[in-house]
């Protein structure tokens, strides 16, 4: 699966977190896990800083990225991608949120 692919959440909180987005660079595809961010239903998200929680519409569902709950998932638990956030606008929003979250400033 490619960086910025969106997959159905294989975890237990699928109602609140219907999707995850793969953040890991393809250079590390040999790994048995993928670094992902949960995509939480926007109406349930506790957004502290809006720039840290970019909004997306996935199959008609409004979600926000939750940078405070980044995780790794085993590849064998992940299904087929259902969407992609690899377009330039989405990539910029994702990377800006991650950069701000991880910045040393």
What are these regions (language model features)?
Residues 1-5, 43, 85, 98-99:
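Short N-terminal helix-initiation segments at or just after the protein's N-terminus
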Residues 56-105:
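C-terminal terminal-subdomain/extension
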